Amino acid sequence: MTIAIGKSSEQPKGLFDSMDDWLRRDRFVFVGWSGLLLFPCAYFALGGWLTGTTFVTSWYTHGLASSYLEGCNFLTAAVSTPANSLSHSLLLLWGPEAQGDFTRWCQLGGLWTFVALHGAFGLIGFMLRQFELARSVQLRPYNALAFSGPIAVFVSVFLIYPLGQSGWFFAPSFGVAAIFRFILFFQGFHNWTLNPFHMMGVAGVLGAALLCAIHGATVENTLFEDGDGANTFRAFNPTQAEETYSMVTANRFWSQIFGVAFSNKRWLHFFMLFVPVTGLWMSAIGVVGLALNLRAYDFVSQEIRAAEDPEFETFYTKNILLNEGIRAWMAAQDQPHENLVFPEEVLPRGNAL
């Protein structure tokens, strides 16, 4: 027997290897390399939003109250976009607009760009986190692929759309009522609901909800257990040793209901992935089109005939008039920097006004 005495053959770890060991260590909350992007960005985005909705006014940018301090509640508080005059400035705290003055920076709308940019990179970090963990446990990266849908929508609505317009001012502010205002704006100024990309997005999201409900109900329906004591609530027993979900029974059921049914789990679950993600991506593509002021369907022949014949009206022509009403009422309120003044006689008035 030979005994070798000497130095270990292991090389001392470099900085990268040491960081890799620490970041990817198995712990209660995984950090990973993606965490270097995710955690700081998520912290700053959420912290900026909480700060803005609690303390910061939108008086200087929109002429509005937008914080709890001013009397707003959770539904009406918001971190609002910068003024239109600031165009696409990044509004850095140390930039020429705020010049390091935190109060002035908040008044100018600097928190909005802060939250939007950190939020976007935080979402990207979360997608990378799913990819990194999938690699670590040898899964395929479909979770990360699925999460690209919400990221595409966020980036298109909050970043690309205002970049195509005159400034960040026309992006949505971060708040519940503020998002509703933005939806009304999209309809009135872009006829968004008649846009085929919006239609595909609605089909994707509502179709995904339908698929999710059908799938959950079908799995619950086809859980079975051998023995005499089986009942509905035994299906929730976590101590059952093995899977007792019957794909064959589910296939027979839906074949009788619809005449067609998924024949294997892979195709079924891929379809459940494909429908919502494709819908979200189509919506994002549509918003990029709106950033460039591309129009939705225009049925000009109906508009001309409606203008010539007072008795001719379609749901399309009614919607066009409603959009004109949204624009007339909204523009003066929504864009105070334009100093728009419309005579009373041109404003549409309903019976309740």
From Swiss-Prot:
- Tell me the residue numbers annotated for binding chlorophyll a ChlzD2: H118
The cellular component terms of Gene Ontology attached to this UniProt record, alphabetical and capped at eight, are: chloroplast thylakoid membrane; photosystem II
Residues where N-acetylthreonine is found = T2
* Its biological purpose: Photosystem II (PSII) is a light-driven water:plastoquinone oxidoreductase that uses light energy to abstract electrons from H(2)O, generating O(2) and a proton gradient subsequently used for ATP formation. It consists of a core antenna complex that captures photons, and an electron transfer chain that converts photonic excitation into a charge separation. The D1/D2 (PsbA/PsbD) reaction center heterodimer binds P680, the primary electron donor of PSII as well as several subsequent electron acceptors. D2 is needed for assembly of a stable PSII complex.
Which Gene Ontology molecular-function terms are recorded?
Answer: chlorophyll binding; electron transporter, transferring electrons within the cyclic electron transport pathway of photosynthesis activity; iron ion binding; oxygen evolving activity
UniProt source species: Zygnema circumcarinatum (Green alga)
- This one is known as Photosystem II D2 protein
Residue ranges the record marks as coiled coil: none
Predominant location: plastid
Which family, according to UniProt?
A: Belongs to the reaction center PufL/M/PsbA/D family.
The record's subcellular location field reads: Plastid, Chloroplast thylakoid membrane
HAMAP family per the UniProt record, alphabetical: PSII_PsbD_D2
Q: How does it assemble?
A: PSII is composed of 1 copy each of membrane proteins PsbA, PsbB, PsbC, PsbD, PsbE, PsbF, PsbH, PsbI, PsbJ, PsbK, PsbL, PsbM, PsbT, PsbX, PsbY, PsbZ, Psb30/Ycf12, at least 3 peripheral proteins of the oxygen-evolving complex and a large number of cofactors. It forms dimeric complexes.
Q: Where does pheophytin a bind?
A: Q130, N143
Catalytic reaction annotation: 2 a plastoquinone + 4 hnu + 2 H2O = 2 a plastoquinol + O2
Q: What else is known?
A: 2 of the reaction center chlorophylls (ChlD1 and ChlD2) are entirely coordinated by water.
Q: What is the cofactor note? A: The D1/D2 heterodimer binds P680, chlorophylls that are the primary electron donor of PSII, and subsequent electron acceptors. It shares a non-heme iron and each subunit binds pheophytin, quinone, additional chlorophylls, carotenoids and lipids. There is also a Cl(-1) ion associated with D1 and D2, which is required for oxygen evolution. The PSII complex binds additional chlorophylls, carotenoids and specific lipids.
